[in-house]
Amino acid sequence: MILDATCCPQNIRYPTDSSLLNESRELLEGMIDTAHQAGATGAQKPRTYRNLARRDWLRFVRDRKPNRKKVRKALRQQLGYVKRDLGYLESILAANPDALSAKQLEYLAVIRKLYEQQREMYENNTHRVDDRIVSLHQPWVRPIVRGKTAVAVEFGAKVAL
């Protein structure tokens, strides 16, 4: 009997570190808005620098082939924006634990793990980390290197046939 490992492909867009961090930042900004509308942030909404962050990310994405220096700069910027927003949400949740819905708390846990992974890869100057998150909406999906000519990396659950 011959066994072969294959993958159940998931339909997700190809994940880049910068796009995952940008998506995380946008979700965090939405959570901060939700908490502020519920009155959990006090009188003044925390600064999210959303316009600057979006401008920085779009400036990076427009580049057809960014060099290594530009990629690291974009990752550093997005990591900073995500870290700031996570800090705001930590203080909001410390004061008012019911400020976010259960679904938002799940996203927050995934974003925390993603931030730690991305920060570790940035600081160690690597592109590999165990149990890497490649989708915020489907955090169980993992990259599987297949070595096929058409697609080198597939995303999904690994199965043995």
For the regions a language model picked out, list residue spans one by one:
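Polybasic low-complexity intrinsically disordered regions
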Residues: 1-160
